[in-house]
Amino acid sequence: MDSSDIQRTSIAVIGGGLVGSLNACFLAKRNFQVDVYESREDIRMAEFARGRSINLALSYRGRQALKAIGLEDQIVSQGIPMRARMIHSLSGKKSAIPYGTKSQYILSISRENLNKDLLTAVEKYPNAKVHFGHQLLKCRPETGVITLLGPDKVPKDIACDLILGCDGAYSTVRTHLVKKPRFDYSQQYIPHGYMELTIPPQNGDFAMEPNYLHIWPRDTFMMIALPNMNKSFTCTLFMPFEEFEKLLTSRDVLDFFQKYFPDSLHLIGKEALAQDFFRLPAQPMISVKCSSFHFNSHCVLMGDAAHALVPFFGQGMNAGFEDCLVFDELMDKFNNDFSMCLPEFSKFRIPDDHAISDLSMYNYIEMRSHVNSRWFIFQKNIERCLHTLMPSTFIPLYTMVTFSRIRYHEAMLRWQWQKKVINTALFFFGTLVALSTTYLLTGPTFRSSLGCLRRSWNSVTYFQNIGRISL
């Protein structure tokens, strides 16, 4: 293609989702010319928005990124605080496990509404534009040239100073980087899928306590429910695919819920459950890791394109938003020099994003199984007690991840150390209690037996001395 056909822009953001639109705001604030290319239609105009609809849990890292572009208050006002997990046992008993102190909470946020607000925020910058219906065909990170297919169905080359790949877990930008030398990539589909259901309002109000993340843990699977602003709850059933495949009829589904989630059955409604369960098949969940996140000084990956997470720590969006914030901080540090900023971004974020990926996998086991354990709850209480007594020394993992900007990999290392300290202390304490109990229970008997042995030995010695027996 002739060079005269190439239109020069400064920054091309591929993907107009959450991370792409937030990144566009950060970069537009720096007076770059920013063009966002989104393959979907404008979700603000669409009658039905395609894509994922899992509710999001907005926490400190994400809020700090929104604060940096002046959107925190607007977004927070549209969320519902969740201060604890509400555990629903099989018997119907409910118990709360606080996330942190009374002032600490996460927010249940609508993915769709947040994306709409971020797109609107991008368009308020005169130097930023969102192009809908533009599919990325080719990416040449060596030169900063991308080929797009727009609504006119004519491929078009665009050159830019920087390509930001924010196009999700199945990133097209990343597929071009994978072909480059020394670019490592791995993906893992977990054996569990998810399905969304709804608990509607009852009598114009929430059907359950609204300020909780409700969990029905059942060891190998679980269901959760997050509150919505319209007083409904979005329920998500996470379960191995083979279990989904066993539920073939409405009767199977109703019997399954009656057995494992009996208190939710009347909340969802039998008729609605029987219909909604078969509306869409269970969806897969993928975990993606790659290294590095950049190529030369022309291309960088962020969000799910760099590190797709399973959703069990509620950090997918928050980690992606923190990517944007860290990149913005590095741009300050290196005075907008991409050749310095991009390598440092990879060096800084890869350990953190790999750590939160591993922690997200672990947290699924905790949510579906460990929360049923009295020992787990006992350990959580010990952690909270130690954190109260020594707030700067002992910090619970969830607090570090959700209510601070402690780097993810540092939080994981610190958590592992704290677990060793607590387990060692509990072992010695348990041993001391066992020895003390043994002494109290057997002490008199032990002393009596010792006295008998002493008298017997004295008798033997006496007879030996007078020559009546020989040993």
UniProtKB/Swiss-Prot annotation:
InterPro entries: FAD-bd, FAD/NAD-bd_sf, Kynurenine_monooxygenase. It comes from the Eukaryota. The keyword Repeat does not apply. Keywords: FAD, Flavoprotein, Membrane, Mitochondrion, Mitochondrion outer membrane, Monooxygenase, NADP, Oxidoreductase, Pyridine nucleotide biosynthesis, Transmembrane, Transmembrane helix. Transmembrane domains are required for enzymatic activity. Pathway: Cofactor biosynthesis; NAD(+) biosynthesis; quinolinate from L-kynurenine: step 1/3. One of its GO terms (cellular component) is mitochondrial outer membrane. Pfam families: FAD_binding_3 (PF01494). It comes from Sus scrofa. Its cofactor is FAD. This is Kynurenine 3-monooxygenase. Gene3D superfamilies: FAD/NAD(P)-binding domain (3.50.50.60). The gene is KMO. Belongs to the aromatic-ring hydroxylase family. KMO subfamily. It catalyses: L-kynurenine + NADPH + O2 + H(+) = 3-hydroxy-L-kynurenine + NADP(+) + H2O. It is found in: Mitochondrion outer membrane.
